[in-house]
């Protein structure tokens, strides 16, 4: 989340690390980046306020994602916005998932494998196509330093995202 910048990075894991820890030796977890946020590097820089550190060729990223997907039983796609794309002075002309990510998601759905969409965002997004074509959607917002473990707990059934506050 936006305030994660004040944490000690070495004490907090990524989504991939959380999923791998939750799976342990019971499942092989495969990973591919899949896409950049946007096709165009300058658009991505303007939208995020930062120059992407690990930007790759979108076609190569998509091809790699499809190779990994072909070896998978279930596809977990972590898509959406980065924290700089939400909030004050972060207007967008579209409230859909950015185009490069939409194309990735559509290609993953075409594989015929079950697709779980993890949606990272700080605002509501228009998900008409996703709602019709993706097996499940979990809006994880910008959860902060424990997001990886928390999302993995939901994916592996350790907790149910019921939205109920305990007393």
Language model regions located:
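C-terminal non-catalytic regions of proteins with extracellular/luminal or membrane-system context
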Residues: 1-167
């Amino acid at each position: 989340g936006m305030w994660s910048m004040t944490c000690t990075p070495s004490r907090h894991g990524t989504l991939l690390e959380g999923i791998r820890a939750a799976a342990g030796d019971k499942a092989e977890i495969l990973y591919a980046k899949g896409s950049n946020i946007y096709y165009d590097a300058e658009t991505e820089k303007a939208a995020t306020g930062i120059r992407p550190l690990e930007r790759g060729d979108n076609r190569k990223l998509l091809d790699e994602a499809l190779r990994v997907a072909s070896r998978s039983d279930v596809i977990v796609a972590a898509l959406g916005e980065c924290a700089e794309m939400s909030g004050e002075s972060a207007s967008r002309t579209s409230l859909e998932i950015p185009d490069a990510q939409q194309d990735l998601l559509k290609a993953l759905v075409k594989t015929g494998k079950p697709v779980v969409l993890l949606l990272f965002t700080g605002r509501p997004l228009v998900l008409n196509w996703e709602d019709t074509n993706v097996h499940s959607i979990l809006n994880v917002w910008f959860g902060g330093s424990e997001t990886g473990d928390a999302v993995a707990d939901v994916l592996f059934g350790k907790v149910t995202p019921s939205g109920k506050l305990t007393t």
